[in-house]
Amino acid sequence: MPAPQVSTIYATSPGGTTLDQDACGGNPFATALIELSQRPASKLSHFLPALRKSTIEKSAGQQVPTCERLPSNRTWAFPMTAGARAEKRIALVLIVSEYLSLANPRLLGAAADERRIASMLAGHGFSVVQAVPPDRQALHGALRSFAAKSKGFDVAVVYSTGHGVEHEGSTYLLPGDYPFLRGYCTTLLAQHAVPVDRIASACKAKKVNLTFFAGCRTNT
């Protein structure tokens, strides 16, 4: 049986930007995700609208989350209920927080969110893989490894952030070695960036597959 389709939840709308640090030290989207995941029996059908509302509030309207491909299983929830005790869960926290060619190379909020999100997921019974790849090659390696592992699990979640852009309708995560001074044309993005769809495709669990992308979607 093929894996269920992956639902991708973006921290902002197409063309939008995100905040690296809020009052809690990270992205407002991450803060909202962590807080809402603690609610008992917060099914996805209620969780996703609440995540959107909370992120808008915490970012003072700058970030308006959107969801691509709604989950087919909307009754699933982060808290482990009695019926979900036997559920096998795996998560990848994929963070790009350092950039080689930028004047301000570190995303301090992204680095903080690696720890915050990993802790939250572990608390909900996930086997958590943390990856901070220094370049595109390592990023692809982390995705291949996770794809192979996630096939043996019931639920797979990826949380990813770093600098991001949107180009011709597709959103990209920019690796730490991206050549920013050369711009963002189609060829450069194909050779040096990673589409969010590629990140989402690493989720191959049997029941629920979710990807959260917290980077910007700045138009190029």
What is each of the regions a protein language model found here?
Residues 1-220:
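Cysteine endopeptidase catalytic domains of the caspase/legumain-like
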